[in-house]
Amino acid sequence: MMSDLPRDLLEERLSRVPVKSLREARFTCKNWKTLSKKRSFTKKHLAQEATSRESEFKVVMVLHCKVYLTSINLRGIHNGFDPSINRQAKLVSLNGTDQIDISEVYHCDGLLLCISKDYTRVVVWNPYRSQTLWLKPSSPDHRMDWYICAIGYEKRKSSLRYKVLRFVDFAEEEFVEYEIYELKSNSWRVLDVTSDWEVEFYARGVSLKGNTYWFATDKFPEISSNLIHSVYFLLCFNFTSERFGPRLHLPCYPMDVDTVSLSSVREEQLAVLFQRKDNLHMEIWVTTKIEPEEVMWSKLFLAVDMQPLTDFKFGIADASFIIDEEKKVVVVFAKDKDVMYPTHNTAYIIGEDGYYKEVDLGKTTDKIRDPLVCSYVPSSAQIKQGGKRKKKGKLITD
């Protein structure tokens, strides 16, 4: 029997179990459960997961307000093989909270920050460790207010302290409050922030090296000839200093009607998708250096005329995407080509030399929200809840 194998050999075998099946393996045998919690096994298992990522992407997808672990396989696409996108497991918790509709997910160091559709509930989740932490808002929520959330960490000498940032835009008062939550102390604090910029409520931040980046614009833009001239730039929140950095330049010059979206590359670089409304020309740029106070951009990663391919512009707020640097392709997640009455969710795979493929993600039940995708890398990060017992979550094969 497998349970009778020597520990080192058993550890080697278990390390090959996919993340989605690890929880089931833990409950198969008491010895396996004990072994799976040891640091040596965790290190080996995460190394095995890193090896598997060389052949396919692991992402988290929000579809129909549910959260799925999804694999994207692009092997052989330039040699006649079709790409594949498969939902492998649904992320749920053990206390019935899988019935809650999730509208947004953010990833940082293996942790997922999930926001409920009605903005009343926020949860931090580590699917690898099956841990969840529900955050209680510091003040009552108001339906007419807007919220922007982000997750990151403070760098200590020997550890990382995870934090959640929340913007509360009080609609009636035209006032924005910035709050930060420390997972370790289980407490909210209000930050003293004075800004001459603003982040739109629909803007999605991207976490990188423990910090979060957004597109931002002037709070008081110039107006001439009755036209508003907004200037867009990159803005970083440093979770260690708990301060926003200076304005960082973009490699493009978007207008209000253009599509501009952020993504991460291997949790080391930022990528920008930029598509003009007037001619549907799409560009992808990638950073060569990215820090809270400095950014450098590579030469153009990809440039494609989308008019003969899709003949429509991706949504201003919904164009979530990933890129494969080696294969020189971008995967954009949106609705089908019927702009007025879409019936299906679709992944558009676009590359050099005219490469173009569509992958049907199934019928859509949400006419407003496009599929939302963010990168996911499993980690052994612990969710600490101020001494309180953590609730458990799990992966269920879809």
Swiss-Prot record:
Q: Which InterPro entries match?
A: F-box-assoc_dom_typ1, F-box-assoc_interact_dom, F-box-like_dom_sf, F-box_dom, SCF_F-box_component
Residues forming the F-box domain are 1-45
For this protein, the parts annotated as crossing the membrane are: none
Output the Pfam families linked to this UniProt entry.
F-box (PF00646), FBA_1 (PF07734)
Checking PANTHER family in the record gives: BNACNNG10540D PROTEIN, F-BOX PROTEIN CPR30-LIKE
Annotated protein name in UniProt: Putative F-box protein At3g17620
